[in-house]
Amino acid sequence: VTKLDVRRALRLALLGVLMLPAAVAHADPPAPVPQPVLPPLPLGAAMRIGPTAGTGTPTRDYGVGATDLCEFMEFPSGLLQVCGDSFAGQGVAFGPHYSPIALHVDMDSVDDATGVRYDGVTGTDKPLLADPTPPASSQLPAGIVAINRENYMLVTTTKDLVPATSRLVKAVPYQGNWPTVPKSERSATYAGGRQSQISGYYDPIPTVESPSGWVYIVANNFDRSAPVELYRVSPQKFTDRSSWQGWSGLPGGGWNKAPTPLWPDQVGELSVRQIDGKTVLSYFNGSTGNMEVRVADDPTKLGTAPATTVVFATTWPDQADELPPPADNQLAQPYGGYISPGSTLDELRVFVSQWNTLPQADNAPYRVIQFAVNPFKP
C-alpha cells in the first residue's frame, strides 16, 4: 500500500463523514399521545369536565382538602401537577398548610372523559422545595418550563400574595427538596417587575442564531398588574435569566430588544405550549376576569391571535359549591388555566382554579376544575 493509497482512503473516509446527515436537535414527543376524549365541540365552545382537586374532590384522601393552580410537569417516569397554597381542610386556612405540593397523576386518567385522577402526593409530609419558606410568607409555583422532560419551575416568594423574589428550581420526580438553580434568584422588581410569573416551551427547530432551537417564554407580573411579554433563549442558557432575549413589536424591534407587551390586557396566570406546531397560550385575563386561550402560528403572533373564552366570570350561586350544567361555562372567581397533556387543537383541556373569597364563605370552595375548549385558530 502506497502513501498515495492511504491519502485517497483518508479522503474517501472524510467525504463519507461530511455526507452524513447533521445531528438535529429534537424535542421529546408528547406523552400521552394527544387525542380527544369528548364528542367534538363546536368551534369556540367550551365544556366543563368537572372538579379534579381541592374542595369536594378525592384529593382529600391524600391530605389535600383544598388547593389551586395544579400546573402539569411531565417526566419519563410519570406526570405531576404542581399546586399552590394547599390545606388539609376543605378551605383556605383550614388545617395544616403546604406550599407548593405535587399531585401524582394517574396516567390512565389523563385521557379519561370523566377527568384526571391521582394516586399520591409529594410535599405534605416533607417540603417539596429545598429552600425553607421565609416567616409569614409563601413559596408559590409561578410557571413551569420543560426542556426534553427536564423540568424547571419558577418559584415566587410572596407575602399576602405580593411578590418579593423569584427563582428557578430543578424538579425531581416523586421526591421533595427540589434544589434552587444557582444564581437564578431575582428581586420582584427584576425586568421591570414583569418576570415574576412565566411559562414556556422548547421548540427544537434550528435557526442561524441557535442550531439547537429556542425556548420561548411568556412572562408577566405575579400580581396580575401587567400585560404579557415574550422572551427566547437557547436551551443551553435557559437557567441564566440574564441571557433571555426580549421581543419588541415596535418598529425596528424584533429579538434581543427590550420586550414590549404582546397586547394591552393585564394578565395573570399563564400556560403556553406548542401543539401541532402552533403556539397555544391559556391565561387569566385580569382586565375582564375571564379565562381565555389564544392559538398562533408562532409566539410573536400571540398578540394578534383571536381569543377564545374558556370560562366567563360570574357571581357566586347561593350554594357556592354548586356548578351549572357542563355546557354552561360560567364560573365565579376563576383563575389559573393550565393546559393538560393530551390536548389537541380541537380539544384543548384546561385546568381552572376557583376560590371563594367572600367574607361569609369561609374561603371555600378552593379547587381546580377541568374544562375542554375548541379554540379559534389562525
How should these model regions be labeled?
Residues 304-305, 333-337:
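Catalytic cores of extracellular degradative/oxidative enzymes
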Residues 349:
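Substrate-binding cleft of secreted/luminal carbohydrate-active enzymes
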